Structures are given as structure tokens and as C-alpha cells.
Amino acid sequence: MSSCSRTRTKAPRSARSRRNGGFSSSSATIVADIDDVLIQILSFLPIKTLLRFKRVSKRWLSLITNPVFSNRVIKSNHPLPISGFFLHSPREIKYSFVSLDDDATNQRISSSLPLWFTDHQTDMIIMQSTNGLLLCKCSCASSNHFNTNYYVYNPTTKQYTLLHQIAGHIALSLAFDPSRSPHYKVFCLRGRSNNSFSSASDSELYHIEVYSSNEGLWRRVVPVPTSPSTFIEFSYSVFWNGAVNWYGFSSRDCLSFDINTQEIKILPLPDHEHEDEPLPDPRILMFLDESQGNLYYIEVNNQSSSNLRVYEMESNSSSWSVKYNVDLEPLAAAFPEMIRTEYYTDRRIYAFSVIGFVKEETDAASYILLHIPNQAVKYNFIDKTFKKLCDFKSLVNDAPEDHFYRFQRTFQFIKSLANV
């Protein structure tokens, strides 16, 4: 065999690199450049599209789930729109889900939606919803006793974090503003135990602790100089305007804690129309929630009145104003099943509850979602039009007469890529 036939031609370096399973520096640069372009394109897409694109390839999955990318998308699209509501049944720990997405016309309602994680098969109870994240709890049996675990959960990505053990607390609240920080905080209103904080003043019966997702631990923030009776019914909370606000159905005020200034103040709820009216009964409607940066409040003390007032407090304000008036009479004419007779007075009442308030970019597009017997109805504030959104008949056939138009609590669902 000639020498030339034995001579092996040396392959180019880039070819050898590919054949050996590696990439040259120029190839890596090209891939990085392609990723940069792809990230630019993906960042303009809605979150529901990004969720579908996660299944395209492992590379796309890696890009979309990268915390830097997800935080960039969330911040550029804030405030994110409400995509639906979780509805808690008063009879069991199950959640129905009502979708507001236009492409969910034929599947608006999902029934018997359990919330549980792989390491805890017991159902979760939602405590609060804030900008796409849920604060949840569950009771888990361990060594002949029950422990209550608390989680921060992203229902969009199915990610969750177990908070460090919490004991002896009075109230919790979740704070998350992705336009300011990718990290969330959980605030705990706690009473002083006999063997803790012995150096604290006897007047400091309560204090606030904070858990930061970037630190992963609890720390004491500030004492609360107030009387014990202030917190008896403060079992609910809403995060609004950089502050956590605790409230209860038997109180006329909210306890507000500004997370930046660490200032504690009382946020009064709107005054009664008549001073001689009693305080709201827990069985009568009370609704307080945030939407697109503003705070909204609805209270019903007289179910025979056809006028439903919606109060608003803007982010740059400290006072309430009547934003909308809802006339229930045309709604009752179209849906006569919401007219009931109160059994102990024989008076005519309107059977309804509030699922949620949705503020859009314009007042003309904003609406309230009401729950009337067996169905959810969307009511537009400005043009006074309404339409049935979904049917609850399959969910409520076994419910008692006085409960089947009410859900115990509702929670916003916002699609988010936020990391927990």
C-alpha cells in the first residue's frame, strides 16, 4: 500500500469538536446569540402561551423557567390580569374554579378541584391570593397529633415552598409585588408567649414577624402597641399598596402594616349609610379585595335593597368613594330565581354573593362577577349590561336551600411564572 494511502487527512478543529460531542467557542457564541434572540421574542408573549411553549423542547423549558427570564416577563407585564377565581365550598375543603379566559367558553367551570401536594395528600386550604401566588395551609397527622403546615404555592407552575414551623400566631398575610421585587414575604401577627421576648415591654402584647423568600427564615420586625380586642376577628388579609391589611367581619377597621416603612396604622372601612344600623352580621355580605392597584369594598346589611354600592380607594388616596352603583332589579328580572322570601320576615330579598371584582384598563370594560342561584353572572358597571358566565347546577344540587347561591370565600387566580 502506498504511503499516500496510509496518510490520514486531519479534520478541521470544529469538525473534530462536534464529532467529540463538544462545541467550539464560536459555536457556543452562536447558541448564546440565538438564545438571546429567542428570549427577546418570548418575553413579548402572554404567559399562557409561554406555558405551552415549555413543552417544545428541553432548551425552551430551561429558558422559560429561568428565574431571570420569568422575573423579566412578570415585571414587564405587571399588573397581570385576573384569569379566574377559586371558589371555596362551605360544605367541604374543595375548590371550584371559574375561568375568565375568552378561550374557555365551553369550560368555564371546573368542579371539585382539590389542592394538594405530593408530600401531603390532605387537601389544602387557601388563605390568601396575591399577584399569582397563594398562601395555603393543611393539617397533617404526625405522632398522634396534628401539625398545621403553611405553604406559598404558585398554581400556574405547581411550585411550592413549605414555610418554617409557625406556632402561636394570630394572623398571616402574604405580600408579593413583582413590579418591585421577585421575592415575596409572609407576615405573621403573633402574641407574645410567656417564655419569649422577655425583654419586651409588658404593653407589647403583639408583634409582627416576617419571612422573606430570599432569606428563608423568620425574623421579628416590630411590636404592635394595641389592645388584644383589636385582633379577635382579624383572620383575613389583603395585600394592597405596599401594605398587608388584616380585617374581620365584626370590625369596622383594618389593621394596616406598611412593609417598607414598617408603619402600623388603622385603615377605616366605609361608614354605614345610617348610624343606627348594627354592625355587619357575618352571614351578610362583606367583600374586600384589590384589583389593578385599587382597593374595593362591598357590604350588604339589607338584602331587600336593590342597590349595591361599590366603594373604591385608589393607591394614592386614603379615603373611600362610591365608584359604582349596581341596580339588582334588572338582573332579578332576567334571573327571577335570585328573588327569595326571607323565611322569618316574609320580605323579598335578593339572593346573591360576590365572586370577584375585575378592573380592566378602562371603566367601560370593568365588571363584577356575581354568584346568583346556580350560576355566575358578569355585570358591566358602565353600560349596565350583564350575561351568564357559567352554570353551577352540577355543583350545588346537594346544597341546603340557604347556601346554594353562596361560596364561603373566593380567591383570584393570576397566571404567573413567579418562582417560589
Curated annotation (Swiss-Prot):
Residue stretches making up the F-box domain: 27-77
Top-level lineage group: Eukaryota
Annotated Pfam families: b-prop_At3g26010-like, F-box
Basic residues bias spans: 7-19
Chain intervals for the UniProt region annotation (Disordered): 1-25
Alphabetical list of InterPro entries matching this protein: At3g26010-like (IPR055290), At3g26010-like_b-prop (IPR056592), F-box-assoc_interact_dom (IPR017451), F-box-like_dom_sf (IPR036047), F-box_dom (IPR001810), Gal_Oxase/kelch_b-propeller (IPR011043), Kelch-typ_b-propeller (IPR015915)
NCBIfam families: F_box_assoc_1
Protein's name in the database: F-box protein At5g07610
Source organism (scientific name): Arabidopsis thaliana
